[in-house]
Structures are given as structure tokens and as C-alpha cells.
Design a protein with these regions (language model features):
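Conserved functional acidic sites
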Residues: 17-226
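Positively charged n-region of N-terminal signal peptides that target proteins for export
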Residues: 1-4, 18
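C-terminal motif of bacterial Sec signal peptides marking the signal peptidase cleavage site
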Residues: 13-15
């Protein structure tokens, strides 16, 4: 009887090893968020402002984010210093716009801008994962959700095989749209950002047609990296 039990136990261990070997390795997702020191990324940006008069103003410019250096915070954790530059046209010189920081911890990625910290990504990455992006600031609960994990994403004529989309807000009705989302690519970082806050025409002749009365749109797209 002991021999049978031993053999059966060995079979179970062998079977479990085979099953585990076929499972994909866990992916913490750290390589999606500011993965390289010294890396710089150029973005094309479009800001659109809609007025009640029916007119709209479109501004286009470029931003460049440079992962400059790291330092230790008061808790001894490594923090990344990022410099952001701006230019109105491609022929213009880059001018420093702002400086902010980012930090990757065991279970999350943090970004601090204008002294406000946000939880941008949670690790390990997982489809449908939700968290409060404002947990480290005083702005109140802001539910983020992770979608389209490791899926292809296309923007600005470029394809990224492994990306993850973070939905920060997606409230849509017949009379308005409030949407915020960011997309990160493995080995690169942020490749797309969308912030839309518009109100639609709600009179009888245009209700439900998606005609914008007023509001703003901010679209940021990956252009190139170095």
C-alpha cells in the first residue's frame, strides 16, 4: 500500500510540474513604466477647445520627456527625475517646460507632478484590475481600471505589440462625454494619452448626434524615442 501511495504522489507532482511549465510566466509590468534611464520620448500633442459659438481652436505642439537621473527619497527608495521640454514647431528649439518624478515600487508605479502623486499602474498587470489613482493625494477617490493587457496598439502610424490601457474615466451620456485614458507600451512607457471633456448639443434637432457644444480635448501620441 505504501508503494502505491508513493507512486501516486510522484505522479501528482509530475503532473503538476507539467501543468505549471505550460503556464505563461507572471509579468509584473515594471517594464511598461519609464523603463530606461537616459531614454527620451517625443510626443505629438493636440489641444482642442470648443466654444458655444460653434468655433473651435486647435493647438499643436510637441513634448519631449527625458529620464534624466535617479535619487533616493527619505525612505531610501529610488526615484526617477524626468525633465519635460516643449516646442511649438519641429524646427524650434526645445524649451524646458517642467520637471516631475516617477517611482516604481513592488506593487505599483507612482508619478508626482506639481506636488501631486498619482498611482499610474498596479503590479502585476492583470486584465480588469482596479484601484484608486488618487490614493496618495487629497482629490478624492478616482477609480482606474486596467484593460487590453498585452494587446496590440496603434498610434501615429506606429504599432506596439505589447501594451496596456489604463482607463481613468469613461462617462458617456447623450449630453456629455468625460473620458481619460493612458496607454503604455512594454520597454517604452507612455505612448498615448487622451483627456476629453465635452458637452453635446441637447436641443431636439441635434440630441444624440454627438455635435459638440463646448469643451476640451487633449490628445498625446508617441512620435519617437531615443
Amino acid at each position: 500500500m505504501k508503494i502505491i501511495i508513493v507512486l501516486f504522489s510522484s505522479f501528482l507532482l509530475y503532473a503538476c510540474d507539467n501543468i505549471n511549465s505550460e503556464l505563461p510566466p507572471p509579468q509584473d509590468g515594471g517594464n511598461f513604466f519609464y523603463p530606461k534611464i537616459g531614454q527620451s520620448i517625443v510626443y505629438d500633442v493636440e489641444d482642442t477647445e470648443y466654444e458655444l459659438t460653434g468655433k473651435f481652436t486647435l493647438k499643436t505642439y510637441q513634448l519631449k520627456e527625458v529620464n534624466v537621473s535617479t535619487f533616493k527619497d527619505l525612505a531610501g527608495k529610488e526615484v526617477l527625475r524626468i525633465e519635460r521640454y516643449r516646442r511649438e514647431k519641429r524646427i524650434d528649439k526645445w524649451i524646458i517646460d517642467s520637471i516631475f518624478t516617477a517611482k516604481k515600487e513592488v506593487d505599483k508605479a507612482l508619478k508626482t507632478e506639481n506636488n501631486v502623486t498619482y498611482i499610474k499602474i498596479f503590479f502585476p498587470i492583470k486584465e480588469g484590475l482596479k484601484w484608486n489613482g488618487n490614493a496618495y493625494n487629497s482629490f478624492g477617490n478616482d477609480s482606474y481600471e486596467m484593460k487590453k493587457v498585452n494587446q496590440l496598439f496603434q498610434t501615429n502610424g506606429r504599432k506596439f505589440d505589447n501594451s496596456v490601457t489604463i482607463i481613468q474615466q469613461n462617462d458617456s451620456t447623450l449630453v456629455d462625454l468625460k473620458r481619460r485614458m493612458e496607454v503604455y507600451a512594454e520597454g517604452i512607457g507612455l505612448i498615448y494619452r487622451e483627456e476629453i471633456k465635452v458637452s453635446y448639443c441637447n436641443s431636439k434637432d441635434c440630441l444624440g448626434k454627438g455635435e459638440i457644444d463646448f469643451g476640451t480635448k487633449h490628445i498625446l501620441k508617441f512620435k519617437s524615442n531615443e
